[in-house]
């Protein structure tokens, strides 16, 4: 099959928005990057908290961490997106729910729902990576810290977590890349990200190959930058002889 490529389509004026088709994709690129960064901040913070809880010698706290992981890992992500956008606002206090649904700009509604959903979903995966990293450390590190008079929180803060951070960099790279790819699902609830803009470009120009090739390259570019940055971080924090070092 012969494909008639026309990359000049991106420089043509879009039907609305006072911009070109390339401007549409650039706008979607910015939304995708913003969503990925904000969702990752949520995922990192929440995931680390619950990951630590899963390793503490307290059955209630560790059970709480397990419940969180099982809840978010075992429900399809697209279902979670629609739950956060359509169901959760109905469960909020009446005034807050009405403000979110009636007064907040729809684009902000889409973004906030997507950010929270993607962040909490990814946090469950981060939680497991943190748990695995802490449990992979030699047991003697924790015992030695406690024997020196440190409390359990101090042992985590000064001994276990600094070493776990170094172990966890490679799997965190994968989770960040997965988050970027999963962000495309946000277009199903109305967020105008790269995937949505590519769909618009296809609808108005009928150039499917060009539009989806362009966003494919954009996703590859974002993840390539993540890989490069995290590779530098991994080399920076690596300690000779430590777990995970070469």
Regions found by a protein language model. Give the residues of each.
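Transmembrane alpha-helices and adjacent helix-loop boundaries
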Residues: 1-246
């Amino acid at each position: 099959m012969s494909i008639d490529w026309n990359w000049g389509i991106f420089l043509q004026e879009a039907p609305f928005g006072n911009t070109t088709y390339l401007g549409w994709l650039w706008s979607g690129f910015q939304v995708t990057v913003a969503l990925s960064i904000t969702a990752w901040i949520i995922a990192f913070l929440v995931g680390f908290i619950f990951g630590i809880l899963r390793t503490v010698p307290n059955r209630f706290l560790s059970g709480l961490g397990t419940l969180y992981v099982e809840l978010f890992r075992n429900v399809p992500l697209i279902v979670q997106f629609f739950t956060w956008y359509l169901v959760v606002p109905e469960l909020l206090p009446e005034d807050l729910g009405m403000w979110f649904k009636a007064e907040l700009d729809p684009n902000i509604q889409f973004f906030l729902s997507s950010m929270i959903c993607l962040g909490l979903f990814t946090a469950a995966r981060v939680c497991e990576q943190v748990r695995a990293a802490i449990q992979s450390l030699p047991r003697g590190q924790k015992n030695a810290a406690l024997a020196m008079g440190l409390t359990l929180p101090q042992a985590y803060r000064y001994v276990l977590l600094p070493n776990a951070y170094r172990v966890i960099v490679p799997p965190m790279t994968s989770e960040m890349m997965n988050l970027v790819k999963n962000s495309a699902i946000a277009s199903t609830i109305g967020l105008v990200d790269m995937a949505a803009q590519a769909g618009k470009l296809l609808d108005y120009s009928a150039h499917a190959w060009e539009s989806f090739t362009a966003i494919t390259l954009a996703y590859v570019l974002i993840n390539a930058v993540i890989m490069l940055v995290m590779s530098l971080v991994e080399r920076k924090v690596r300690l000779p002889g430590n777990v995970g070092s070469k």
